[in-house]
Amino acid sequence: MVEFFTQTTTGAILLILLQCLLLVVPLLVALAFLMYADRKIWAAVMMRKGPNVVGAFGLLQSFADFLKYIVKEIVVPAGADRAVYFLAPIVSLVMALIAWAVIPFNDGWVLSSLNVAVLYVFAVSSLEVYGVIMGGWASNSKYPFLGSLRSAAQMISYEVSIGLIIIGVIISTGSMNFTAIVHAQDGDLGLLNWYFLPHFPMLFLFFISALAETNRPPFDLPEAEAELVAGYQVEYSSTPFLLFMIGELVAVVLMCALTVLLFFGGWLSPIPGLPDGVFWMILKMLAVFFMFSMVKAIVPRYRYDQLMRLGWKVFLPFSLFWVVFVAFMARYEVLGGFWARFAVGG
């Protein structure tokens, strides 16, 4: 059996497919419960009960919603480009999913350990905007088109800042491999070795940029209900709409994973002496997701001009300055052992 999977082409392909399923299926199941948690957190802030009917404590509400979307009729607008219309949500979801191929959950728990994993994720996540643009253009309606234009401008604007922020971490680590980045944060001081301390300003900027990149409140301008009804998703229903929604959630969880890997030590234990493991990775991702949900519940939506001004006039200059600052500190070992512990990979 082992020889079949390791020495034959068919076995190798089946092994890759099995590995993909072992990654995608738990991720999609987790999304259902994360969506439930998101709605419960939002309800708690607004002093409501939230989902509480389907299943114990409403735990099966997300599965009921998925089933509802699947059995609904798919209504295609008159004059829509049918091929592009149906391709758009598929592109959006696939681009979000394939980025997970290089995300490690523990030592060796990764589908593909690339030396340029950071560059791969950045490139693939940049392609997600094409699904949004295709959906807005193919719908043959003004509101989806305006929403897709907003989304394209917003995602491109904040991808620049995210790229510069990640460059600062790469300079500190000397590698674009996520496993190497996590190992660079290992040490006898536990969480004091993690990059959230020396790169705290960039952690703050990365979190806000991740909200904008994934179109989460308060930066959900592409689907502003008061202005654009539902943005680029206006003319979508049933399964295509569900694919768009899942793609957005996958992108949000991906940003949570990136935040943990880059700034919070990945699967490393926060307390010296406790064993490292996937438990810490998942716990940290849940904590970051909780912050995403709280921002959605308590922060009002920005205006579009404020969003663009924040990205180009505040985040971009500051993140560029930080890259130069980190490079200078690492090159000349300023502050001696303190910065050297963080800025030259330990």
Curated annotation (Swiss-Prot):
Pfam families given in the database record: NADHdh
EC nos: 7.1.1.-
Intracellular or extracellular location(s): Cell inner membrane
Primary site of residence: membrane
Catalytic activity: a quinone + NADH + 5 H(+)(in) = a quinol + NAD(+) + 4 H(+)(out)
Family: Belongs to the complex I subunit 1 family.
Record function comment: NDH-1 shuttles electrons from NADH, via FMN and iron-sulfur (Fe-S) centers, to quinones in the respiratory chain. The immediate electron acceptor for the enzyme in this species is believed to be ubiquinone. Couples the redox reaction to proton translocation (for every two electrons transferred, four hydrogen ions are translocated across the cytoplasmic membrane), and thus conserves the redox energy in a proton gradient. This subunit may bind ubiquinone.
The name this protein goes by in its record: NADH-quinone oxidoreductase subunit H
UniProt organism field: Jannaschia sp. (strain CCS1)
